[in-house]
């Protein structure tokens, strides 16, 4: 099926923060752009400028100074379908430059998403974009495919949602899935807040993007939070400077590790929830006693929010403290984990055994959107 570019399947990982899209069988996504739709805040005065009423992705990012930026996907759930359609349209026609009606399309979603969300996704794919076939896969399961395992527990932390999914011999264990609506975007908001304490004010949607960049470039996870706070208070060795787009230079110190510490202590942002190390442990404890050993030995990290330096060591330390003392614990943090969901999708969609799993246009016409629950796990 994948010999020719004509009928290659498309893989589109719609994250809350980034869309990763490309062709099945490739080893990396061709298009990676922010899931943003921007609309002008001001009246257009120059005629013939070809101004649009909305901008998508990188174009919205580059004109962000005059736009209001909105993310149509919040916490992994699509909240604005009109904007989402714009993003898909942009993905197919501008980024990949393909006609969706010629390619089967694999989409991804977070586990424990509302059922209506997948149905509407299915409906738009078949009715608006006329795809010949489609499938909706769970993100964390794809990450496991990408790491070459069939057993393990995935911690998938993106921009909108973090979840732990234990998979045993290729089966996800739905009763043990843990979902935490705390992820990259919440960390960005928290960083905006604690930078205000230093006297740097960031308020607009465009300035939030600057803070996101600061977060991605300078934040790290401390192995021991209290010690690190003491070090930061007594010396300036942890301080780093960052140049804003207008040339101002700001200095940040303990904010560098206070921001991602929220993942381990959600009470920092007022969330009454266990940290990611505890949800991972709780998820393993909900699984059958016989398979826990294999899960402890295969903790796979995936998603952009697991890209902080030091996060793997910290997870190792925290889970070791919770688990039985004789247990062997291994955290797997592949360097390409930012895209591992997409890579897993690319692997899945190009398997010969997967070809009968697609939902075809014909099946959709017969059964309607609810077919997605029967055919996609």
From Swiss-Prot:
Pfam families: Actin (PF00022). Oxidation of Met-46 and Met-49 by MICALs (MICAL1, MICAL2 or MICAL3) to form methionine sulfoxide promotes actin filament depolymerization. MICAL1 and MICAL2 produce the (R)-S-oxide form. The (R)-S-oxide form is reverted by MSRB1 and MSRB2, which promotes actin repolymerization. It catalyses: ATP + H2O = ADP + phosphate + H(+). The modification Methionine (R)-sulfoxide is found at residues 46, 49. It is found in: Cytoplasm, Cytoskeleton. Its main location: cytoplasm. InterPro entries: Actin, Actin/actin-like_CS, Actin_CS, ATPase_NBD. The modification N6-methyllysine is found at residue 86. The modification Tele-methylhistidine is found at residue 75. Its EC number is 3.6.4.-. The modification N-acetylcysteine is found at residue 2. It is an enzyme of class 3 (hydrolase). The keyword Nucleus does not apply. One of its GO terms (molecular function) is hydrolase activity. SUPFAM superfamilies: Actin-like ATPase domain. SMART domains: ACTIN (SM00268). The keyword Heme does not apply. One of its GO terms (cellular component) is actin cytoskeleton. Keywords: Acetylation, ATP-binding, Cytoplasm, Cytoskeleton, Hydrolase, Methylation, Muscle protein, Nucleotide-binding, Oxidation. The modification N-acetylaspartate is found at residue 3. PANTHER family: ACTIN. Polymerization of globular actin (G-actin) leads to a structural filament (F-actin) in the form of a two-stranded helix. Each actin can bind to 4 others. Actins are highly conserved proteins that are involved in various types of cell motility and are ubiquitously expressed in all eukaryotic cells. In vertebrates 3 main groups of actin isoforms, alpha, beta and gamma have been identified. The alpha actins are found in muscle tissues and are a major constituent of the contractile apparatus. The beta and gamma actins coexist in most cell types as components of the cytoskeleton and as mediators of internal cell motility. Belongs to the actin family. This is Actin, alpha skeletal muscle. The gene is acta1.
């Amino acid at each position: 099926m994948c010999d020719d570019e004509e009928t290659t399947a498309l893989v589109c990982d719609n994250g809350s923060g980034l869309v990763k899209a490309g062709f099945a069988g490739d080893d990396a996504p061709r298009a990676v752009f922010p899931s943003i739709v921007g609309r002008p805040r001001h009246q257009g005065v120059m005629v013939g400028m070809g101004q649009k009423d909305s901008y998508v992705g990188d174009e919205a990012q580059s004109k962000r100074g005059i736009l209001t930026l909105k993310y149509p996907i919040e916490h992994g759930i699509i909240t604005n379908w009109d904007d989402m359609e714009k993003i898909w349209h942009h993905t197919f026609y501008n980024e990949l430059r393909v006609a969706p009606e010629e390619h089967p399309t694999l989409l991804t979603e977070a586990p424990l998403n509302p059922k209506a969300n997948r149905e509407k996704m299915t409906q738009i794919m078949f009715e608006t974009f006329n795809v010949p076939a489609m499938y909706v896969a769970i993100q964390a399961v794809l990450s496991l495919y990408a790491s070459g395992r069939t057993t393990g527990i995935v911690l998938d932390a993106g921009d909108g949602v973090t979840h732990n999914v234990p998979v045993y011999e290729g089966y996800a264990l739905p009763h043990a899935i843990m979902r935490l609506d705390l992820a990259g975007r919440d960390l960005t908001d928290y960083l905006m807040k604690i930078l205000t304490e230093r006297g740097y004010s960031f308020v607009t949607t465009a300035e939030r993007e600057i803070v996101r960049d600061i977060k991605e470039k300078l934040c790290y996870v401390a192995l021991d939070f209290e010690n690190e706070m003491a070090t930061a208070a007594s010396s300036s060795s942890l301080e780093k400077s960052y140049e804003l787009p207008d040339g101002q230079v700001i200095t940040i110190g303990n904010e560098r590790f206070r921001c991602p510490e929220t993942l381990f202590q959600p009470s920092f942002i007022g969330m009454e929830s266990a940290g990611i190390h505890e949800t991972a442990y709780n998820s393993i404890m909900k699984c059958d006693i016989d398979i826990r050993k294999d899960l402890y030995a295969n903790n796979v990290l995936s998603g952009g929010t697991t890209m902080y330096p030091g996060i793997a060591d910290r997870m190792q330390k925290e889970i070791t403290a919770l688990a039985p003392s004789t247990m062997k614990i291994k955290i797997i943090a592949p360097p390409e984990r930012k895209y591992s969901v997409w890579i897993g999708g690319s692997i899945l969609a190009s398997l010969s055994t997967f070809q009968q799993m697609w939902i075809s246009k014909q099946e959709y016409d017969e059964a309607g959107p609810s077919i997605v629950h029967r055919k996609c796990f």
